[in-house]
Amino acid sequence: MADNNTLNITNSLEYECVEPIKKINDQADVNEWVNTEAFRRLMKFIELSNESVINRKISDPCLVSEFVQRIINMLDTMLSWIDEIPPLPTPQRFGNKAFRTWIARLEENSVKLHQDMLPEHLHGTIVELVAYFNGGFGNSTRIDYGSGHELSFVAWLCCLSLIGVIKQEDYTAVILKIFTKYLDLVRRLQRVYMLEPAGSHGVWGLDDHQFLSYYWGSAQLKEVQYWAKVNSGLLKMYIADVLKKFPIVQHFLFGSLLPFKAANQGG
């Protein structure tokens, strides 16, 4: 890593993008995962993002770079697909099968969306980026959505930071603009297609679908008395209840940007 305040790896190491694959097959792999370079990079992105929104309102003005705006436009396009793919009118017990059509459109268009968004010299990274992006909106087989899908989307944002297109000065907009738009999209998907919660904790859980929205949201209140403790506690809870839970992270993918290898402690 170039320094302690950035995730850009393009100038500090060579990488060759590959199609990401599953590596977590049992609890022993979960124990190994928390000591990997992928975990370290992801946690660094999550924590730097948290720092960028301390005491910031969603309505506060912030820098919106051209690239950040491209991502927002891409998510707006995907929102419009919901209007074009209405839910099926026939009664369905578990979710609406029209969601499968929406996911199919995402998978058909994902590469082109990334080609339009990225500069040409970074098109080689698309093979990794689309794997995380496509996994960020729910499962078409089970017609569900949960914190594992949220994790996949955040991993996509992390990868964009790793290749240098999201810069440190963009982090505030990444949360206040991009992630907020993402929440608008996935919450509408949940409502329109009646997505089942993936891995619900019931009354013992914070939320059936999201988690990081609460962590980053608590950072926005961090200067209010006691909320700093809430913020740090939510990060510990996220690690314990999401990142260390096999049913969730068994689906996580690893490539060259988020590698399943021992963490570089000096980075």
PLM region spans:
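N-terminal leader regions that mediate targeting or early regulatory function
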Residues: 1-135, 140-145, 149-153, 176-180, ...
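Short, flexible helix-adjacent loops and helix caps
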Residues: 142, 165-166, 194
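Short glycine/serine- and small hydrophobic-enriched flexible loop segments
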Residues: 158-163, 219
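Inter-helical turn/loop segments and adjacent helix faces that build the functional surface
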Residues: 162-173
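Short secondary-structure subsegments characteristic of cysteine-rich extracellular domains
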Residues: 171-187
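Charged/polar, low-hydrophobicity segments characteristic of intrinsically disordered regions
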Residues: 183-209, 222
